Swiss-Prot record:
Protein name: Chloramphenicol acetyltransferase
Assembly mode: Homotrimer.
Gene Ontology terms for molecular function: chloramphenicol O-acetyltransferase activity
Residues of the active site: 189
Family under the similarity heading: Belongs to the chloramphenicol acetyltransferase family.
SUPFAM superfamilies: CoA-dependent acyltransferases
Catalyses which reaction(s): chloramphenicol + acetyl-CoA = chloramphenicol 3-acetate + CoA
Catalytic activity, EC: 2.3.1.28
Function in brief: This enzyme is an effector of chloramphenicol resistance in bacteria.
Amino acid sequence: MTFNIINLETWDRKEYFNHYFNQQTTYSVTKELDITLLKSMIKNKGYELYPALIHAIVSVINRNKVFRTGINSEGNLGYWDKLEPLYTVFNKETENFSNIWTESNASFTLFYNSYKNDLIKYKDKNEMFPKKPIPENTVPISMIPWIDFSSFNLNIGNNSRFLLPIITIGKFYSKDDKIYLPFPLQVHHAVCDGYHVSLFMNEFQNIIR
């Protein structure tokens, strides 16, 4: 996948990037999202919720360059043409989880079929990363389906090198005849401001309606 290098000296975000990159500033925003219609739709069509959410998340990311901006293995700042989801799958027997990646696709049906095939192959491997090699252009997505929450924060001590979003979904719940989902989005302030987080949340909510 193509990685497009950003010239920091001419980048209009240079001042902001340097400030927050040196501060190592990350932050997380958790929003309560209405998934009532999405739940009804996937139930009627026989789909599972998790891959539907993964597909919607990656759709938003791949529409917006800011969420694909990062640092590659050679230490260059830039952005990938697209990101692939690297998502967690729980093993009930061992109580461990695996991280599996599946190639993204604009078609949900095609993505869903690939997701199911990868699940069959790798979910019982009892390895942290059973599907190898893992491409550089992946975005971490996970779900904690046993508990709902109002906030979530994940800290990475990597000297600010990880700039991509991190998504950790909570357990959905019912309220006022609707179904809601705790949806935390964690970003690095060097590349993402509050405006961009709002953009992500609004686009995601529109997709799942």
